[in-house]
């Protein structure tokens, strides 16, 4: 009986965070349905006074596994993305939201034998976002540029989606208040923004190519600052949408 209970707990943990294995296409919808069912039951226990009660989000931590993303020496984007994404998840849950992570470990979402890993990885991320459970998504990334002087967090959105634009502007406003970024929210031509069926944003949390910002991005305290700004922006967006 204990083994059975442990298996069930492990299964639902795997479903909720959507990590730890490579999904075949036919099983992903089933896993997402199970996750949505569990999350819907959890929502009943959330205090309704919390600002994000009854709201559900997908947090997409960019890159992972064989795809490190941007790099500077031994500093890897994918690891920092995941650290920030986990902080965002924690804060969203504290505010009453339900959360699914596209990944919660050092892996991508492509199968082992897939030739075009990047395409498969992105398709799986979008499939998770489009599961029918989420109200919105947030994709976490870091930037890099040929000039070492460029720095600052910046939020991107799909140009024709008014809700995504509003979310991006609210998050950018909070990032500007919490960090020294001078960037503005702007439209972005990214697969992760074009294909989902719900509003969402891509947050470039800073530049690994900028020495001072690179040091900040590796700091747990700065990661928490970024996460809080993102979640404060989400709360402001939800209030605006009401």
Region spans (language model):
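Catalytic-site microenvironment of enzymes
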Residues: 2-242
């Amino acid at each position: 009986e204990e083994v059975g209970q442990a298996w069930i707990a492990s299964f639902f943990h795997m479903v909720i965070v959507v990590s730890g294995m490579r999904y075949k296409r036919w099983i992903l919808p089933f896993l997402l349905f199970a996750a949505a069912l569990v999350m819907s039951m959890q929502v009943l226990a959330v205090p309704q006074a919390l600002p994000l009660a009854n709201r559900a989000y997908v947090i997409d931590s960019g890159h992972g596994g064989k795809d490190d993303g941007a790099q500077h020496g031994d500093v890897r984007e994918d690891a920092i993305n995941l650290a920030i994404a986990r902080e965002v998840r924690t804060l969203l849950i504290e505010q009453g939201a339900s959360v699914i992570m596209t990944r919660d470990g050092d892996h991508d979402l492509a199968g082992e034998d897939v030739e075009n890993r990047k395409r498969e990885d992105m398709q799986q991320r979008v499939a998770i976002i489009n599961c029918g459970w989420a109200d919105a998504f947030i994709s976490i990334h870091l930037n890099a540029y040929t000039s070492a002087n460029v720095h600052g967090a910046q939020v991107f959105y799909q140009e024709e989606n008014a809700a995504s634009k509003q979310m991006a502007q609210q998050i950018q406003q909070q990032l500007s208040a919490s960090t020294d970024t001078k960037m503005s929210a702007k439209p972005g031509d990214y697969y992760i923004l074009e294909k989902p069926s719900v509003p969402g944003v891509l947050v470039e949390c800073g530049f690994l190519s900028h020495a001072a910002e690179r040091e900040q991005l590796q700091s747990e305290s700065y990661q928490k600052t970024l996460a809080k700004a993102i979640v404060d922006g989400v709360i402001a967006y939800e209030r605006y949408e009401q």
